[in-house]
Amino acid sequence: MPGIRVLVVDDSVVIRKLVSDLLSADPDIEVVGTAVNGRAALQKVAQLRPDLVTMDIEMPEMDGIESVRAIRATGNKVPIIMFSTLTERGAVATLDALGAGASDYVPKPANVGSVGRSMEQVREALIPRIKSLVPRRGITPHPAGVTVAPTATVQLHAPATPPLGGHRLLVIGSSTGGPEALSALLHTLPPLSVPVAVVQHMPPLFTRQFAARLDRQLPYDVVEAEHNQPLRPGTVAIAPGDYHLEVTTDAAGLRTRLTQAPPENYCRPAVDVLFRSAVAAVGPAVLAAVLTGMGSDGCKGARLIVERGGSVLAQDQATSVVWGMPGAVATAGLAERVLPLLELGPEILRRLARQRPSLVPAGALS
C-alpha cells in the first residue's frame, strides 16, 4: 500500500537528512523529495504533488511564510507543517505562517548534537500530525461512527433546558487548526455578556503572542490568563502554554486558577481540565464549543457538562483541519449542534441572547 507522500523543505542539509530518515522509517510515510528553500519548494510541490509538506520558516531566497502564501495562491490545499523555533520570534513567525495558510507546526530540533533525543521528540510530534492531516490509506485520524455531510448542520441530542438565569460562562477548546479557527470564531462575536475561557494546545511564548495578536484585532480584551485573575464579561482568557487553566468561583465572581498538574490526554493545558472546572464553578450554566483539533481532549469534560445540564457545540468535519476533538464529541453524542465554523458564532449569540437580557451594556468594558 503506498505511503503518505511527503516533501521535506529546509535549508539545512543536516535537518533535511534527519527528518527524511525519521519519516522514511515509518511504513505509512514515503519521502518523495526535498527542497533547500521556499522557491525550490514551489517547484517541487508542482512537480511531485506531495500529500504533505514539512517547511522550515527561516530560509534564504524565499522563506517558509512566503512559500506558504505562494503555494496557497495557486489554489493548492496540500497540508503544510511548519518547523518552528520555541522563541518569541519563532512564535510570531509561526502565527504568521498559520495565518498564511499553514496547517500546523512542530518544534524544530533545537540541538542537533543530541540527535537521538532531539529527533525522538520531533518524531513524537510530527508523525501523528502527518497521519491526522492526511486521512487516507486506512489511517483513521478521527473517530469512526458519526458521519456528517459536508454542509450539514446536525443536532445530535435533544437540547438542554436553558439554565435558570442563563449561561454564565463560555469555554472553548481547540488544537490543530485552532489558531485560525478560534480567530475566525471570535471575529464573528461582539463583546459578550459572559466571560470566555479558552484552551488552545500551544507551547509557552506562543500563547502569549497569540493572545496579544487577537487583542490587537478584536474590539474587546483578549489576554493570556494569569493566576487568580477575575474572569469578566466581554473578555477572553487564553490558557498559557504548559499550564492548565481552571475556572473557580468566589463571592466576587469567577476567577482563573493556573496549575502544572500532570498533563491530561498528553496535553497541558488540557481542554478536559478547563471543561471539568467550568462545571464545578457554574454547573449547568456553561456553554462549551469544541473546535478543530487532533485527538479527543475535551470529550470527557464535554460529557460532564452534558450530564450537569450544560450545552456543547462542535465544529463540523468539513470546516475542521482535523476532526479529532470535535469528532470525538460528536461521535459520543454529546454535541447539541455540529456546525460549520462560521455558524458557531451566530449559534452562540442566539443561545446567549435568548437567556440573557442583552449583550454587554455600553461602558461595561471601560
Curated annotation (Swiss-Prot):
Say which enzyme class the record assigns. hydrolase
Q: Where is the Response regulatory domain?
A: 5-123
**Which Pfam families does this one have?**
CheB_methylest, Response_reg
Presence of the UniProt keyword Cell membrane in the record: no
Listed under GO biological process in this entry are:
chemotaxis
Give the catalysed reaction(s), semicolon-separated: [protein]-L-glutamate 5-O-methyl ester + H2O = L-glutamyl-[protein] + methanol + H(+); L-glutaminyl-[protein] + H2O = L-glutamyl-[protein] + NH4(+)
Q: Single GO cellular component annotation?
A: cytoplasm
Task: Give the EC number(s) under which this enzyme is classified.
Answer: 3.1.1.61, 3.5.1.44
Modification after translation, per record: Phosphorylated by CheA. Phosphorylation of the N-terminal regulatory domain activates the methylesterase activity.
Q: Which UniProt keywords apply?
A: Chemotaxis, Cytoplasm, Hydrolase, Phosphoprotein
Q: Where in the cell is it found?
A: Cytoplasm
Q: Which CDD domains match?
A: CheB_Rec, REC_CheB-like
Record PTM 4-aspartylphosphate, positions in chain:
56
* Entry's Gene Ontology molecular function annotations: phosphorelay response regulator activity; protein-glutamate methylesterase activity; protein-glutamine glutaminase activity
Catalytic residues, per the record, are 175, 201, 297
Tell what the record comments on domains.
Answer: Contains a C-terminal catalytic domain, and an N-terminal region which modulates catalytic activity.
User: Which HAMAP family does this UniProt record tie to the protein?
Assistant: CheB_chemtxs (MF_00099)
Q: Which family does it belong to?
A: Belongs to the CheB family.
Q: State the name under which the record lists this protein.
A: Protein-glutamate methylesterase/protein-glutamine glutaminase
Organism placement in taxonomy: Bacteria, Bacillati, Actinomycetota, Actinomycetes, Propionibacteriales
Q: Gene name? A: cheB
